[in-house]
Amino acid sequence: MRKLFTSESVTEGHPDKICDQISDAVLDAILDKDPNGRVACETAVTTGMVMVMGEISTKCYVDIPKLVRETIRGIGYDRAKYGFDCETCSVITSIDEQSVDIAMGVDEALESKKGEMDKLDAVGAGDQGMMFGFATNETKEYMPMPIEMAHKLSRRLSEVRKNGTLPYLRPDGKTQVTVEYENGKPVRIDAIVISTQHGPEVYLEQIEKDIKEHVIKVIVPSELLDENTKYFINPTGRFVVGGPQGDSGLTGRKIIVDTYGGYGRHGGGAFSGKDPTKVDRSAAYAARWVAKNLVAAGVADKLEIQLAYAIGVAKPVSISVDTFGTGKITDEEIVSIVNKVFDLRPGAIIRDLDLRRPIYKQVAAYGHFGRTDIDVPWERLDKVEEIKKHI
């Protein structure tokens, strides 16, 4: 049976991604000085303006306007002709402390209040909700091919802009890849869509030629392309006005880009700007860690795990697994292995993945999962042998 599946990615200069990177830059700056700081930082951008808001409880001081300007400069919006300038944009901040009602549940979990002695029970989940982790062996990154290929194309767009290969490119851009599957395995790429902001001096014909030569051919293996592969490069014909001048942006608006490109389910919670006591982030990272190690251990070809939490309670209220018919053992047996090998209380996740560190801005663009260009703890295959002992 053949079917098509499509996923998209965006570059670091996309308005929503600017916001994610600013929020995580603030988080990293606080965790660097105060590892126990509580951060829920949201950012909005529009023409000539950035607003940073949220709830932050910390013992340290960070210069938020300076962080904002440094982040925007690093992305590439450093002159007015790009429609957004790190030096001249206004920066507005509105920061409150974390709610005492939330803090009391995180500081002392329900289990601790009942007298349970394990110190990891003292850290309650920062919110209720469900988080999903996913892995598949269809790529070496254990990610679905559509999102993995879309991310690589987006990163390449930024690379050829910054290294001067295509100096007329601007920071904003999007990619989209449609993969054809046969009996559950990727066999070819059916369509590639790339929209990239550019200077007014260049024409579409040149952009199409350069993107095919310096982006697509460099990234996409030739065996996945054929005479029927369709290419859509700047299909509107012109993309000069972009970034916050073209669209306003908000933190947390690219949650499917951040995860599995729609191939796996999503619990709805965004990542950026949240410290690791927020299970929206830490438990989603843990779920990816669990799923990737299970697939790498040969438990299944494809696996999705759901974790669910109650605010102020340490232990997950439920753990569910789906192997989509690819499991070598039953889903119930896999859940049993998960409970034996992994401790999924928030305090244990923070400890085992060492999450109270400034490691978040680096994943705020080009995906939080499947990253081989950086070392992030939830991508490590450090539980494979232990899992195999229980199969």
From Swiss-Prot:
It catalyses: L-methionine + ATP + H2O = S-adenosyl-L-methionine + phosphate + diphosphate. Coiled coil: none annotated. HAMAP family: S_AdoMet_synth1 (MF_00086). Transmembrane segments: none annotated. GO terms for cellular component: cytoplasm. Its EC number is 2.5.1.6. This is S-adenosylmethionine synthase. CDD domains: S-AdoMet_synt (cd18079). Belongs to the AdoMet synthase family. L-methionine binds at residues 55, 98, 247, 278. ATP binds at residues 14, 172-174, 238-239, 247, 253-254, 270, 274. Residues 98-108 are annotated as: Flexible loop. Its cofactor is Mg(2+); K(+). It comes from the Bacteria. Homotetramer; dimer of dimers. Pathway: Amino-acid biosynthesis; S-adenosyl-L-methionine biosynthesis; S-adenosyl-L-methionine from L-methionine: step 1/1. PROSITE patterns: ADOMET_SYNTHASE_1 (PS00376), ADOMET_SYNTHASE_2 (PS00377). GO terms for biological process: one-carbon metabolic process; S-adenosylmethionine biosynthetic process. Catalyzes the formation of S-adenosylmethionine (AdoMet) from methionine and ATP. The overall synthetic reaction is composed of two sequential steps, AdoMet formation and the subsequent tripolyphosphate hydrolysis which occurs prior to release of AdoMet from the enzyme. The keyword Transmembrane does not apply. K(+) binds at residue 42. Binds 2 divalent ions per subunit. Mg(2+) binds at residue 16.
